[in-house]
Amino acid sequence: MRQEQTLFSRPLPIALFILIALAADQFIKYLVEAYLPFQQGVPVMPMLALYRTYNYGVAFSMLSGMEGWFIVGIRLAVVTFVLWLWRRTPKDRFFAHLGYAMIIAGALGNLVDRLLFGYVIDYILFYTATWSFAVFNLADSFITVGAGAIILDELLQAKKERSLKL
């Protein structure tokens, strides 16, 4: 039986998606660097501010004390692993392939920052009067939403397999 190919299971669409997402991430970071004051909140709406800061580590500033090339190596290993998963995943799994594309785009967006500046530019802050979430960026959002898409795909696949057994 022939598997139906989803859009992001093909190399050209995934490459275009990644390039467009990477360009959007880098353009926004350029604007943030050019116009947003450093470590001063600019309220956008209740509980959301723009707040430019630099992350010298990985997610939530973990590993910020590590050598920069070690972190670059980790990011390259993640991209390589996700590409490997993308190639091995059945071609009919739309959300998984979309998730892989988003994770790759996000990892590359932060990798470009790391290579150019030695840190990642973060600028989105959710907060209340007594609490604030870690400052993050569009690339981080791609990674998070991409992981969610992969989990959704797994849940849908499990449901599909259960319904076929009935």
UniProtKB/Swiss-Prot annotation:
This protein's UniProt keywords: Aspartyl protease, Cell inner membrane, Cell membrane, Hydrolase, Membrane, Protease, Transmembrane, Transmembrane helix
List the Pfam families: Peptidase_A8
Q: What class of enzyme is it?
A: hydrolase
Per the record's keyword annotation, is Cell membrane included, yes or no?
A: yes
- Listed GO MF terms: aspartic-type endopeptidase activity
Q: Which domain of life is it from?
A: Bacteria
EC number in record: 3.4.23.36
**How does it sit in the bilayer?**
Multi-pass membrane protein
| KW GTP-binding (keyword) present | no
Pathway entry: Protein modification; lipoprotein biosynthesis (signal peptide cleavage)
Q: What main location does UniProt list?
A: membrane
Report TM segments: 12-32, 66-86, 92-112, 138-158
Q: Name one GO biological process term.
A: proteolysis
Query: Where are the active-site residues found?
Result: D122, D140
A GO CC term? plasma membrane
Q: Which reaction does it catalyse?
A: Release of signal peptides from bacterial membrane prolipoproteins. Hydrolyzes -Xaa-Yaa-Zaa-|-(S,diacylglyceryl)Cys-, in which Xaa is hydrophobic (preferably Leu), and Yaa (Ala or Ser) and Zaa (Gly or Ala) have small, neutral side chains
The UniProt entry's sequence similarity note says:
Belongs to the peptidase A8 family.
Q: What does this protein do?
A: This protein specifically catalyzes the removal of signal peptides from prolipoproteins.
Q: Which HAMAP family match?
A: LspA (MF_00161)
From the Swiss-Prot or TrEMBL record, give the protein name.
Lipoprotein signal peptidase
Species of origin: Rhizobium meliloti (strain 1021) (Ensifer meliloti)
| Encoding gene (name) | lspA
